[in-house]
């Protein structure tokens, strides 16, 4: 009986990237585990948490792709958001309790001036309701206990902040930003600049690095596919590193690299590169700028978007 149970839960090796359109009300981890179950994947991770209230692009890394998740964690991101003016909440979003209210008297000009003030290199104080840790404990645990701890402001870059529309006391905005940006904090800061307070009521992530939500699949659509067809939705592992220079090695060089050897190679400027051997993605290497290539992060299987 025990052997039969183990057999039923046996996972398969799946390598690739699933671009998931996360629904509202689901945690990122719950979405990950559902997708992992539908793909019967042995190993999976995600590349940047979305709050339960948020929807949109959540790239999931499977198998060998988990080794390169940091590439997306460090990437720029884009969002569309709705900010409700006149009410500030303790969480910065609609799930929190109101802590301040004020009448809303804004104009198109005042809105655009406030958006301009929040564009460029700015500093943000991370919200208490966040997963950042203090003394090994997430800030949201302190917040739930009614404890507020001091947080240092952190530099972030808002590449663009665009007004999409105004409906009553709500603003629709589009944000293009660096990693580490809290759109909830932007909503709070925007409300304060407008003199009336504000909080986030809707958030949708539309882009991470090279990936767009238009390319993503919902859990409902994934589940509707025949089990054997689902893996066909995966992007290959090297889609995570497509922005890096490409180095091609012959079979002999590739063999040495996979043994951890440093090679002489025409790899140009210093920095990370993606390495291929006879067309196969081998992983990441680092060039020193003087013709020397060192292995940094290599795949341990043939890294494709298909099951091995």
UniProtKB/Swiss-Prot annotation:
Belongs to the pseudouridine synthase TruB family. Type 1 subfamily. Keywords: Isomerase, tRNA processing. Responsible for synthesis of pseudouridine from uracil-55 in the psi GC loop of transfer RNAs. Its EC number is 5.4.99.25. HAMAP family: TruB_bact. It holds the Pfam family TruB_N. The keyword Isomerase applies. This is tRNA pseudouridine synthase B. Transmembrane segments: none annotated. One of its GO terms (biological process) is tRNA pseudouridine synthesis. PANTHER family: PSEUDOURIDYLATE SYNTHASE TRUB1, TRNA-PSEUDOURIDINE SYNTHASE. The active site is at 51 (nucleophile). It catalyses: uridine(55) in tRNA = pseudouridine(55) in tRNA. It is an enzyme of class 5 (isomerase). CDD domains: PseudoU_synth_EcTruB (cd02573), PUA_TruB_bacterial (cd21152). The keyword Isomerase applies. It comes from the Bacteria. One of its GO terms (molecular function) is tRNA pseudouridine(55) synthase activity.
